[in-house]
């Protein structure tokens, strides 16, 4: 029975069963490895794909094999990808970063929650059954201190998070010895700096320059450090979250775990339904990846969905609430200025960003400047106290191909650049959000404008979608644009699922969106010439040419689908060793023919060589032993 045919009660029960029976799980023929750093508690997780040996000769009774090296790959699944770790969603994940946060001695536990709304929720006994039981006591920077990774980087301090990231970004490629696997085409990097080996000092330098961010709230110690910047691997974000009409806490936690399994580097909780506060707590306590939010969504819920009733005070309380829960980055639509709103009147699709439309409506109804812009310095002060990164939202992004690259879009982008410099005054980390709907020939301008206007702060885009004609397939239309803008320098790609413009995605939609965007991100890394990016491709090509079917499945981004497609026509075990697939059959397989040509050419070379030696032997008189001068 597919998810779409289940009742709401059945969906919740299924999600609850998933949570109750959750165990650490490895991908087929993969194992979890940990690469250690300079101190014992820096243990960086990676997935190592084990490969079978290559048959190189011998006989049927005595075959000769050559070993193939295991291929290490980046792993976002956290403890969920380690079969040796006991998982208990009720207790949450281990607090990996807590010792590092405590050792810095620049933060302190709060006596009480700073948010009035949080205090109200905690006092409500009716929420006991929904509430995560092991609530942390939130921390905040001590008076006069800043606790951001940007602050440490500017002070010349290499944090454990930075060392963790350096090891992670190198992806264990130093373990690979095979020249075949290490071979890589030169890339075209459009000015990106891509060192052969990423060091902790390089990570620090990039963060200090504002070219990269490490989203790592001190109240989310469960997260594994990662970095977003154009001089690192291209990252992918997945969106989850309930709505007023569908989804539950259990389903959102299930989607979180599912997202990290399929490669989400960060996850945004875009919940707009009931129990937003409680849902977010469960997500944070069980998330090994950074969590982002759009605080204006929850602030709007607090005023019963009436945009005109929003106030700075309600929004500020929401920021404090979420920062003390552990949210790692906020999307803030502070660039939607009153004077920019009329620019959207001539658009075909107007303002399509939820956050952008909320703020535009507030500005027009009060005929005042955006209160997020007016109070931006106060927002930065809050972020600096918890190390919440800012994702400056593109509230005026184009929602159709016709509206791409217009005056409203780039006016807002210029303002985001000004806000970036203000945030940096407070040592707050910043990335910039981008479009949207942009045809292929207009995509590169978005990247060059962002780098110039926003001082090389990391770019984070939704696609962009390259055509508007394919509802139901917008993971494809946007994946094309995502690969291109990732190549041009975009640091993180926000996935689009097949449900875009149509409905709230389910588990399968999340997987489809993530696989599509992992392809786009990897294609961008290859095109940029990111060191080591081609290793997995080379391993796959070698396995494909050698008809190592199991290795082909296991090297795939989605081993299960690869195997299922193969087995639709060749399900027998003999099909896993056959030197053909059902596409061409045994007589027309190009790779089988290529192998035969190669073997024939090698035999011909040997035969010609033997003939030459025979002729030389006869020319020298046919003597078995020659005098030294003749030899």
Swiss-Prot record:
The protein's required cofactors: [4Fe-4S] cluster
Chain residues that bind Zn(2+):
437, 501
Q: Which reaction does it catalyse?
A: 5-amino-1-(5-phospho-beta-D-ribosyl)imidazole + S-adenosyl-L-methionine = 4-amino-2-methyl-5-(phosphooxymethyl)pyrimidine + CO + 5'-deoxyadenosine + formate + L-methionine + 3 H(+)
Which enzyme type, at the first EC level? lyase
From the UniProt record, which GO molecular function terms apply? 4 iron, 4 sulfur cluster binding; phosphomethylpyrimidine synthase activity; zinc ion binding
Q: Which residues bind substrate?
A: 239, 268, 297, 333, 353-355, 394-397, 433, 460
Q: Which Pfam families match?
A: ThiC-associated, ThiC_Rad_SAM
Key word Iron-sulfur present: yes
Q: Which residues form the signal peptide?
A: none
Pathway as given in its UniProt record:
Cofactor biosynthesis; thiamine diphosphate biosynthesis
NCBIfam families, sorted: PRK09284.1, PRK13352.1, thiC
- What interactions and quaternary structure are annotated? Homodimer.
> Matching PANTHER family, A to Z?
PHOSPHOMETHYLPYRIMIDINE SYNTHASE, CHLOROPLASTIC, THIAMINE BIOSYNTHESIS PROTEIN THIC
Matching HAMAP family, A to Z? ThiC (MF_00089)
- The name under which this protein is listed is Phosphomethylpyrimidine synthase
Species of origin: Salmonella typhimurium (strain LT2 / SGSC1412 / ATCC 700720)
